């Protein structure tokens, strides 16, 4: 991820490198603290309330680091923090600690859920007011997932499906951005240069990567808007190919599987819920943004953990890694009893299923649809390549040159020597694409 950011946006690469150093320092410091997991559990209300207050502050002193845009960051002395990123982590900490402490209620639903609904509802209200809809969706998903893991009751997941569907319908009625993203997702080819521009360019980048990619630094992922952040998966797919895409998906799957393994062997319910919730957090967010890049899901605008540009996201992801390592370290302790393992198995199967679908989607664009996408008139990659690598000559049977390259590498253009045969030879134009023999003989 860092290499791709440096390659696309060097100034952001420098910032991300500094954030990586800070995140590594926080990680090392956390390993030396006496018992950070106990501190997180003991002050669960304080942590979540602090996160809510920081998020609320963005309504008054929020900024957008790149100039004009959604003011979701808090800034000071050139350092910017997006509070909604650690807020997701703090929600998982709060729910895990609260549910572990409230087991004695034996799931009297009114008594159990009231505090969680108040705090989670407050967080959702803030995120919706900010139009940070991708984070709001993750919040809602994590809330029901952790509740399902703690209760083991299928009705929780049934309620989750109903709530998410209702939220999607209501959101599409209230928020124009959701309507636009849904339309772009369902039929991107209707407006490929307008509202669907991002997703169309993203899948073109994946298609351009084919099986092995163009090579580091040799593709054109910069054609995809915000390729260093929201669409970094497409950028990696173009230069590393389907092989790199599958490798990245495999790493996400390995991370989630190791996190769930730590959850199953955790010595307490609190640590079990925490490990499973944080693993689900990384998995769900990765699936959402990769799915958006591949048109498997509507765009959400969240980051790809550990990969996309974003200091707040990187720092939060390193803290998640720290917590998972702390939970998995004490191997000498006996795992806490697990009367209902089915929810954890279903969570693992769901993650595997989703990642498999994404792998098939990447293969579909990179292999099956690569040829037609590469020759589309709105795909500028062929035109860029033709400027640097000559297309060669078209000759008749007598050896007469009909069409040839003129110019030098970087400024090659096609010249037709026999205009009367242009209907046959066709054209290779940066705006209108390929036709005639230029299209039929395209390498």
Per-segment meaning from a language model:
Residues 2-131, 290-305, 309, 313-318, ...:
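Membrane-helix boundary/helix-loop-helix interface segments in multi-pass membrane proteins
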Residues 25, 110-128, 133-173:
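Hydrophobic alpha-helical segments of polytopic membrane proteins
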Residues 39-44, 109-114, 151-162, 337-349:
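Membrane-interfacial entry segments at the cytosolic side of transmembrane helices
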Residues 21-23, 238-257:
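Hydrophobic alpha-helical transmembrane segments
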Residues 54, 58, 93-97, 123, ...:
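Alpha-helical transmembrane segments of multi-pass membrane proteins
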Residues 262-301, 307:
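Loop-to-helix entry and N-terminal half of a specific, functionally important transmembrane alpha helix
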Residues 65-73, 77-80, 156-248, 266-274:
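Hydrophobic, glycine- and aromatic-enriched re-entrant/interface helices and adjoining loop segments
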Residues 328-443:
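Periplasmic/cell-envelope proteins involved in peptidoglycan metabolism and beta-lactam response
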């Amino acid at each position: 991820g860092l290499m791709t950011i440096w390659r696309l946006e060097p100034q952001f690469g420098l910032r991300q490198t500094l954030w990586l150093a800070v995140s590594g320092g926080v990680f090392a410091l956390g390993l030396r603290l006496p018992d950070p997991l106990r501190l997180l559990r003991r002050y669960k209300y304080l942590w979540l309330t602090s996160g809510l207050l920081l998020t609320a502050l963005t309504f008054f002193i929020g900024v957008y680091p790149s100039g004009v845009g959604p003011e979701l960051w808090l800034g000071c002395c050139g350092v910017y923090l997006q509070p909604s990123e650690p807020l997701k982590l703090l929600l998982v900490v709060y729910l895990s600690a609260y549910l572990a402490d409230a087991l004695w209620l034996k799931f009297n639903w009114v008594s159990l859920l009231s505090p969680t609904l108040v705090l989670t509802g407050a967080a959702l209200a803030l995120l919706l007011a900010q139009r940070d809809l991708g984070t709001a969706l993750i919040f809602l998903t994590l809330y029901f997932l952790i509740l399902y893991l703690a209760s083991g009751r299928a009705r929780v997941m049934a309620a989750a499906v109903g709530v998410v569907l209702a939220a999607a319908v209501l959101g599409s009625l209230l928020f124009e951005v959701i309507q636009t993203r849904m339309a772009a997702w369902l039929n991107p080819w209707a407006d490929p240069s307008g509202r669907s521009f991002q997703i169309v360019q993203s899948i073109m980048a994946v298609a351009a990567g084919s099986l092995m990619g163009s090579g580091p630094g040799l593709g054109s992922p910069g054609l995809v808007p915000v390729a260093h952040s929201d669409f970094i998966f497409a950028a990696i797919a173009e230069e590393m190919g389907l092989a790199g895409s599958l490798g990245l998906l495999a790493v996400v799957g390995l991370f989630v599987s190791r996190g769930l393994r730590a959850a199953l062997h955790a010595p307490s319910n609190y640590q079990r819920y925490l490990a499973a919730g944080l693993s689900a957090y990384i998995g769900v967010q990765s699936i959402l943004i990769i799915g958006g890049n591949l048109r498997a899901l509507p765009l959400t605008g969240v980051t790809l953990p550990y990969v996309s540009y974003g200091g707040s996201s990187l720092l939060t992801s390193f803290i998640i890694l720290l917590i998972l390592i702390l939970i998995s370290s004490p191997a000498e302790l006996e795992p806490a009893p697990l009367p209902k393992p089915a929810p954890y198995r279903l969570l693992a199967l769901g993650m595997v299923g989703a990642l498999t679908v994404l792998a098939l989607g990447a293969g579909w664009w990179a292999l099956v649809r690569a040829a037609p996408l590469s020759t589309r008139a709105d795909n500028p990659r062929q035109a860029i390549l033709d400027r640097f690598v000559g297309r060669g000559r078209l000759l008749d049977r007598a050896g007469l040159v009909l069409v040839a390259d003129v110019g030098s590498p970087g400024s090659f253009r096609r010249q037709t020597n026999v205009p009367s045969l242009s209907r046959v030879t066709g054209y290779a134009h940066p705006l209108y694409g390929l036709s005639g023999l230029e299209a039929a003989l395209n390498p």
